[in-house]
């Protein structure tokens, strides 16, 4: 199987070429154009920007650890806040661990929601869009609640 070549005898294509609309009509092959020329330039540019920023503006690693001064509450990184909140608020620890494990299991089921639907527009896929919206709101709610004291963490201190 080779590169699809245009039929230059096609009158529609000849009309487009005459108007200057035929460039890239059939696309360019990824080999060798993209893989040998464009990708390395982008990768080297990204590495150069990262190294340049690291040299020009080095960030501090943080305060040195003090084993004799422990913070009152140890919080995980920000992206673990929702599952930390689940583990913190569920009284049964086994149930909390099972609920934490249900997060990736639920994420694995998302592609199979309405997978027979041929539409890519999210407004024409109501079930998947609703699941995404509810999951996003729940993750933000739990993430904000994880930063608050345990007493007002589920209500975010509003009630």
Swiss-Prot record:
Membrane topology: Multi-pass membrane protein
Annotated GO CC locations: chloroplast thylakoid membrane; mitochondrion
Keywords: Chloroplast, Electron transport, Membrane, Photosynthesis, Plastid, Thylakoid, Transmembrane, Transmembrane helix, Transport
GO biological-process terms attached to the record: mitochondrial electron transport, ubiquinol to cytochrome c; photosynthetic electron transport chain
Localization (cell): Plastid, Chloroplast thylakoid membrane
Function: Component of the cytochrome b6-f complex, which mediates electron transfer between photosystem II (PSII) and photosystem I (PSI), cyclic electron flow around PSI, and state transitions.
Homology family: Belongs to the cytochrome b family. PetD subfamily.
This protein's encoding gene: petD
SUPFAM superfamilies per UniProt: a domain/subunit of cytochrome bc1 complex (Ubiquinol-cytochrome c reductase)
Cited Pfam families: Cytochrom_B_C (PF00032)
Subunit architecture: The 4 large subunits of the cytochrome b6-f complex are cytochrome b6, subunit IV (17 kDa polypeptide, petD), cytochrome f and the Rieske protein, while the 4 small subunits are petG, petL, petM and petN. The complex functions as a dimer.
InterPro entries assigned to the protein according to its UniProt record, in alphabetical order: Cyt_b/b6_C (IPR005798), Cyt_b/b6_C_sf (IPR036150), Cyt_b6/f_cplx_suIV (IPR005870), Cytochrome_b_C_euk/bac (IPR048260)
Record GO terms (molecular function): electron transporter, transferring electrons within cytochrome b6/f complex of photosystem II activity; electron transporter, transferring electrons within the cyclic electron transport pathway of photosynthesis activity; ubiquinol-cytochrome-c reductase activity
UniProt key word Membrane: yes
Name used for this protein in its record: Cytochrome b6-f complex subunit 4
Major subcellular site: plastid
UniProt source species: Adiantum capillus-veneris (Maidenhair fern)
Membrane-spanning intervals of the chain: 35-55, 94-114, 130-150
């Amino acid at each position: 199987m080779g590169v699809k070549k245009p039929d230059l005898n096609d009158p529609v294509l000849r009309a487009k070429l005459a108007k200057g609309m035929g460039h890239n009509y059939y696309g360019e092959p990824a080999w060798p154009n993209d893989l040998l020329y464009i990708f390395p330039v982008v990768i080297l540019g990204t590495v150069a920007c990262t190294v340049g920023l690291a040299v020009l503006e080095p960030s501090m690693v943080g305060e040195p650890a003090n084993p004799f001064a422990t913070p009152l509450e140890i919080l995980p990184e920000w992206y673990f806040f929702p599952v930390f909140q689940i583990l913190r608020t569920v009284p049964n620890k086994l149930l909390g661990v099972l609920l934490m494990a249900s997060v990736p299991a639920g994420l694995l089921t998302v592609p199979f929601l309405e997978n027979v639907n041929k539409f890519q527009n999210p407004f024409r896929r109501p079930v998947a869009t609703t699941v995404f919206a509810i999951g996003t709101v729940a993750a933000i709610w739990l993430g904000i609640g994880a930063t608050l004291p345990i007493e007002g963490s589920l209500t975010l201190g509003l009630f």
